[in-house]
């Protein structure tokens, strides 16, 4: 919360919607009560429902949401207001870079924004969610988040937005994303992959769908992709040059892939850039 209330940009409408936490959340919310436009802590319909409620209450011209584990950097809101302030009538989504970090291991890595590609977004969610901001016009055109989704609700919404809105990249670092063992992304297992398959069936090409169907059917393939991703990330942090030279050696042992399955697409789906 401090990363928001301590921003240099003051024209902020800040609402907090908590699903009834039993820790010190209410105590902390009361501490910041004077700096919040609205807050509540009670059982709700899940993350998508809470996000929809927050945006339904919002009256500002530029919108975003920040999960409880994540942070804005000190200059985020000033930078976003400068980039979007003169374009408020257009349906524009702004996205930037993000620093990933782990408090337990003290690991940090900057994940820069990359050029927007609708085709790549249909394959994998490459956007840094805490670093996305959009004009109110986007919300009016795209509509609310799908409350039936649990793991890929943001990706589904981004895909819907990409059909009717302009995505604009900034090189600025806009957020910090905290990694920990209890995250939904890492803990979802087969349920998460089944939901991702549902999303690509809605939005993506038959070729992309076939790759997700393959991964849903083959848990060992998902394991190898995850293993390769982690090894490659560690090598990149140690020596990007060596990582690039041995990337092919880290290829999962998919010797007998079906003819319609491409190893490079599987590599994209793993999330490594």
How would you label these PLM feature ranges?
Residues 105, 138, 149, 155-156, ...:
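C-terminal subregions of glycosyltransferases and related glycan-biosynthesis enzymes
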Residues 1-190:
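Nucleotide-sugar donor-binding/catalytic module of glycosyltransferases
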